Amino acid sequence: MLVLVSPAKTLDYDNPAATTEYTLPKLTQYSEQLIEECRKLTPADIASLMKVSDKIAGLNAARFESWSPRFTTGNAKQAVYAFRGDVYTGLDADSLSEDSLSRAQSQLRILSGLYGLLKPLDLMQPYRLEMGTRLANAKGTNLYQFWGDVITDEVNASLKEQGDELLVNLASNEYFKAVKPKLVNGTIITPVFKDRKNGQYKVISFFAKKARGMMVRYILDNKVSNLEELNKFDMAGYYYCEAESTAASPVFKREE
């Protein structure tokens, strides 16, 4: 079982990672090409393109400028510990056991606008480049065109490496669009999380993101390897709703 998640906008480079182990990202030759394009942008360009404040635009212009093709523990941090945000709150990587972290390294992949696909312990320099950014590049007008089949090929390689054909999509639509489902050598499962509010069950972004992270944690801690085990997910009050589920899209609900 291979699991895909989105990255996060919020980063933490102040606190040390929970492990000194690290690996190096595989697709940095592509990252370098994107950094070259990003360095052409002024802070005002970045503010407009990314719809961020002048302060955040300035910070990211500086990040693009200082980005180096050489990754060290001085300029980078393991991705799963660097990302902060709702998904990563749910995952709580800081408290993973050694066994669960080891499973994460083979079973969890993080989609990224700049790095393509990251293993949890891949060193990552700070950046902000969301997959939906319309950044003109040598291959087109956006990052989906830039990455083409590259990310899908890496997903297939990771699926093959970890030994089965089940791909659990816990990423957002924006990020999963970088994967080409028809080219995936496996079965794609996309869990849906619904919370009850005002008498109705609906997908509430904040809760759904956190639930995705909790499901990753559940998979790692419980050595989940098939759909039957996945559907037993019951963290934080969620329960499997068979009536609304399909094989490709299991639905999990939670009361108010």
Swiss-Prot record:
Listed GO biological process terms: response to hydroperoxide
Gene Ontology CC: one annotated term: cytosol
Pfam families named among the record's database cross-references: H2O2_YaaD
Family designation: Belongs to the UPF0246 family.
Name of this chain's protein: UPF0246 protein Swoo_1284
